[in-house]
Amino acid sequence: MTESVLDYMSRLGRDARAASRLLARAATAQKNRALLAAADALDAARAELSHANEQDLAAGRANGLEPAMLDRLALTPARIDDMIEGLRQVATLPDPIGEIRDMRYVPSGIQIGKMRVPLGVVGIIYESRPNVTIDAASLCLKSGNATILRGGSEAIHSNQAIARCIQQGLAEAGLPAAAVQVVETTDRAAVGALISMPEYVDVIVPRGGKGLIERISREAKVPVIKHLDGICHVYIDVAADLDKAIRVADNAKTQRYAPCNTMETLLVHAGIAERVLPPLATIYREKGVELRGDAATRALLGADVLEATEEDWRTEYNAPILSIRIVDGLDAAIEHINTYGSQHTDAIITENFSDARRFLAEVDSASVMVNASTRFADGFEYGLGAEIGISTDKLHARGPVGLEGLTSEKYVVFGDGHVRT
């Protein structure tokens, strides 16, 4: 790690810490002005954004980036529209900062409650997608947090162009420029520095591949909000409605293959397998989904179903591949999910209320669903407006992390000259 990178990151950290104190007391209207002005700046800078993005795409093609990575990197006109709309949408969301709840009198006569406050400085580390710059900056700004954004080197020109628009919005609203800072060096040492500055950074949110997140979780000296895998399950109970089961299991797998809330393993009660699996298998085959199953599944569906290995149950495919297991009942389904799952999102399809309640209580995941597709595990679908990511951790934020997940609470106490006796 070079001294210059350390000095540079320390300067960003100091400036962010100072800006966070100003942001914490900024009025809602002022934060909204910054968001709306940034949206207007993006709209006016479409040509500049496209030019910067083409620089990144050209470099990516020259460096042999895979087509999927190039697709994530591209800022199409539609994606620029989405970024602009995203800023304007966040401006309409309720501001959680300063909200006081649970006010109550205690026997001593003092009144106690909790006030929602920003976390302080949020470090975001992400890969490829320039639109994350807008998502992260807008949510952090609205929740009163300063943010330091370290995007992937492959998107450096795009991120810098987006940052200039955000800076314009901050300036027009009279907010400090250091409220949103983009790391402008591609030196990987910047990541190590960012995750090792607890004096300046309060939390890190990594968004990227498993290797990146594992490294940050292992090395960070700052709390991390993260999820490693999206190994999501749908369990079709013996008391499932057949039409609901087929509709949900189809959507959970085939609506999109890459997102982290896509089903990777289908569990089916043995008592309903013969009725539900053949029609589902037909749908999957027509859509080009490769099926892998246990012995019972292969015996039922035919030789074109590949043998599922132990590794399959632990794999997030992000592809048209599905593992299927026939289980004896609810106990076996819950045991499988808690053994092989990633604590992300899991669903049961059933008309049995007690089975549904048991599933909700005993499956140890951030989102647990009844008769609904795992694809709903998303900040927008949950009514959060937007999300900065999904957390499978249990401390602080869990599930889709929106504005409230970027805040904390402090106790507020009112008295009238009260003293403790």
Curated annotation (Swiss-Prot):
GO cellular component, as recorded: cytoplasm
EC number: 1.2.1.41
Any one GO BP annotation for this protein: L-proline biosynthetic process
Catalytic activity: L-glutamate 5-semialdehyde + phosphate + NADP(+) = L-glutamyl 5-phosphate + NADPH + H(+)
Cited InterPro entries: Ald_DH/histidinol_DH, Ald_DH_C, Ald_DH_N, Aldehyde_DH_dom, G-glutamylP_reductase_CS, Glu-5-SA_DH, GPR_dom
Name of protein: Gamma-glutamyl phosphate reductase
Family of this protein: Belongs to the gamma-glutamyl phosphate reductase family.
Species of the source: Pseudomonas aeruginosa (strain ATCC 15692 / DSM 22644 / CIP 104116 / JCM 14847 / LMG 12228 / 1C / PRS 101 / PAO1)
Positions of disulphide bridges: none
